[in-house]
């Protein structure tokens, strides 16, 4: 019984770890490569309000694009 539960948990976890996570990180890598502006969540520490993360650094040069 216990073995069966473990197998089911593994089967549930595998698609997420393999698919979702890799897609998430591939998306990030693609946006960094192409130079698209990315949100501050990629910067550490996060950018201040109104600044944009670009290549891991904060920049306010995109303020005009944000409609404010």
Curated annotation (Swiss-Prot):
GO terms for molecular function: ion channel regulator activity; toxin activity. Its main location: secreted. Residues 21-68 form a propeptide. Residues 1-20 form the signal peptide. Expressed by the venom duct. The keyword Secreted applies. One of its GO terms (cellular component) is extracellular region. The modification Leucine amide is found at residue 66. Disulfide bonds: none annotated. The keyword Secreted applies. It comes from the Eukaryota. Keywords: Amidation, Disulfide bond, Ion channel impairing toxin, Neurotoxin, Secreted, Signal, Toxin. Contains 2 disulfide bonds. It is found in: Secreted. The cysteine framework is XIV (C-C-C-C). Probable neurotoxin with unknown target. Possibly targets ion channels. This is Conotoxin Cal14.13c. It comes from Californiconus californicus (California cone).
């Amino acid at each position: 019984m216990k073995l069966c539960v473990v197998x089911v948990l593994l089967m549930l976890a595998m698609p997420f770890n393999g698919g979702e996570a890799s897609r998430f990180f591939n998306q990030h890598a693609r946006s960094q490569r192409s130079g698209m502006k990315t949100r501050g969540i990629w910067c550490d520490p996060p950018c201040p309000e109104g600044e944009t993360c670009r290549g891991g650094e904060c920049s306010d040069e995109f303020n005009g694009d944000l409609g404010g």
